[in-house]
Regions:
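Glycine-rich phosphate-binding loops that contact phosphosugars or nucleotide phosphates
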Residues: 98-262
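Extended, charge-enriched "interface" segments that sit outside catalytic cores
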Residues: 1-101
């Protein structure tokens, strides 16, 4: 077996694993020793790609669950990301980001980490310290709901209120805020607790804020009857679906992450 330390694709992509090879690291005989397991893994991945089935994979409630994360990079009418869903996100971006001055994302695990990584890569650590012109009109972005830290809730709220007060004192009117809770089940404790806290506190400050909400959750499964979905229906909030077969660590490549990317 030839381990040259690099895997190159025709597209130009190169995976360099040379730092993993060596006398006290991985050797060719180590790969040969687990070759049967590797072949089994390759067969299993091929099955996932073919029909979305992974033998023995169960959902949290113990029921068989499809696995569709391999389909996320491909945009097609029968995949999670369709031409229509991408256009819907683009339209939402134009409508919402252009009219909001602050956006707060609420999520935990994959519904938070992937979005935070996207934001840090494209906006950097000091985005919210930039002036509106430097942000090219895009809103300030905040994250919460990944823990139950009441002090963090209060300190971030104080900062948002402080900025809104300065804006109003300058005669520039109310601050328009978008709240975006992201939870597949619609019942995630940390996410819902943070969302409800900020929603109620900001709504109390009627002279300072105009508050809107967009909900990202499972609209077809059990979550469709969750209190969050019921609130979305009652208040006519815009919603985006989290479809089955995509776990939290991969959801950044579907609506939960793409809404941040948009």
């Amino acid at each position: 077996m030839d381990l040259n330390g690099k895997l190159k694709l025709d597209s130009g992509f190169c995976f360099d694993y040379s730092n993993m090879l060596g006398e006290k690291l991985i050797k060719a005989e180590d790969i040969l020793a687990v070759q049967d397991k590797i072949k089994l893994a390759v067969k299993g991945l091929a099955q996932i790609r073919s029909n979305g089935v992974s033998e023995g994979h169960l959902s949290k409630n113990g029921e068989p669950e499809p696995v569709y994360f391999t389909r996320l990079p491909m945009m097609a009418d029968d995949n999670h990301n369709t031409p229509a869903s991408i256009e819907s996100l683009k339209a939402y971006s134009k409508q919402s980001w252009d009219t909001k001055e602050a956006v707060i994302f609420f999520g935990i695990g994959g519904s938070y980490l992937g979005n935070k990584v996207l934001f840090d890569i494209h906006a950097g650590s000091f985005w919210n310290q930039k002036k509106a012109l430097e942000r090219r009109g895009f809103p300030k972005v905040f994250f919460s709901g990944n823990n139950l830290d009441a002090d963090q809730y209060a300190s971030m709220l104080d900062e948002i209120v402080r900025q809104a007060q300065y804006k109003r004192l300058a005669g520039q009117g109310k601050t328009r805020v978008m709240l975006i809770p992201i939870t597949k089940s619609g019942t995630t404790l940390e996410t819902i607790a943070a969302f409800v806290y900020y929603y109620e506190q900001l709504k109390k400050e009627k002279e300072l804020f105009e508050v809107d909400v967009t909900v990202v959750t499972d609209l077809d499964g059990e979550a469709a009857t969750s209190p969050l979905c019921q609130l979305a229906t009652e208040n006519n909030w815009q919603t985006f679906d989290i479809k089955e077969g995509v776990g939290g660590r991969f959801c950044v490549l579907s609506n939960p992450g793409l809404i941040t990317a948009a």
